[in-house]
Structure formats: C-alpha cells, structure tokens
Amino acid sequence: MARVKRGVVAHAKHKKVLEQAKGFYGRRKNTIRAAKAAVDKAGQYAYRDRKVRKRNFRSLWIQRINAAARLEGFTYSRFIFGLEKAGIEMDRKVLADIAGNDPAGFKAIADKVRAALA
C-alpha cells in the first residue's frame, strides 16, 4: 500500500479555519493555533446567543405591549389576562407590531379587552 502524506489534508483544514477567522484581531486571524481557539469560542458564543436572541426579542415585545397598554389604562398583566378572557389569541410579536404601527388597531383590541374584563 502506498504511503499517504497528509500535507494536502492538513493544509485544507488549516485553510478552512483561517477563512472562518477572517476579520479577527491580531494573531487570531493568521496563526492556526490561535485561530482555531478563536473560531471554537466564536461558535460557542454564536450558539449561546441564538438562544439569548429569542429571550431578548420576547422581552422587547413585552415592553412595547406594556407601554401601549398603559396608554389605554391597563397594566401589562391585566391586558394579557383580558386578552385570554376575551378569547383573542394573538402572540406578543404581533401585538407589539400592532402597538407600534397601528395605534387605532391596538385601541380596538384594548376596547375588547376592557369589555371582557367588565
């Protein structure tokens, strides 16, 4: 069996890591050992922050709904309770969008909530 020299494979692996490290600062962009560590850590941050992004957006939507609900005389929790009682099934993303872009529409929803709570 012929001897296989691994130079081509190693070069390809190194090239792949260095391409992923493009734009990094200092040694992290051109030294294979530092680049590999930096790329691994970047992957960990990316994985974690894909989860955190979902939390952050939900929090933002809640803040926007709360602000709009308070203009209508509700607290956030009373408003959400009223939505459930009125049978309005709308997620927080859509409610936040309506609150920001269609104040008249949000007022109509708030009126239905007010009627359901009365």
UniProtKB/Swiss-Prot annotation:
<dbReference type="GO" id="GO:0005840">
    <property type="term" value="C:ribosome"/>
</dbReference>
<dbReference type="GO" id="GO:0003735">
    <property type="term" value="F:structural constituent of ribosome"/>
</dbReference>
<dbReference type="GO" id="GO:0019843">
    <property type="term" value="F:rRNA binding"/>
</dbReference>
<comment type="function">
    <text>Binds directly to 23S ribosomal RNA and is necessary for the in vitro assembly process of the 50S ribosomal subunit. It is not involved in the protein synthesizing functions of that subunit.</text>
</comment>
<dbReference type="InterPro" id="IPR049946">
    <property type="entry name" value="RIBOSOMAL_L20_CS"/>
</dbReference>
<keyword id="KW-0689">Ribosomal protein</keyword>
<dbReference type="Pfam" id="PF00453">
    <property type="entry name" value="Ribosomal_L20"/>
</dbReference>
<keyword id="KW-0699">rRNA-binding</keyword>
<comment type="similarity">
    <text>Belongs to the bacterial ribosomal protein bL20 family.</text>
</comment>
<dbReference type="InterPro" id="IPR005813">
    <property type="entry name" value="Ribosomal_bL20"/>
</dbReference>
<protein>
    <recommendedName>
        <fullName>Large ribosomal subunit protein bL20</fullName>
    </recommendedName>
</protein>
<dbReference type="InterPro" id="IPR035566">
    <property type="entry name" value="Ribosomal_protein_bL20_C"/>
</dbReference>
<keyword id="KW-0687">Ribonucleoprotein</keyword>
<dbReference type="GO" id="GO:0006412">
    <property type="term" value="P:translation"/>
</dbReference>
<dbReference type="GO" id="GO:0000027">
    <property type="term" value="P:ribosomal large subunit assembly"/>
</dbReference>
<dbReference type="GO" id="GO:1990904">
    <property type="term" value="C:ribonucleoprotein complex"/>
</dbReference>
<keyword id="KW-0694">RNA-binding</keyword>
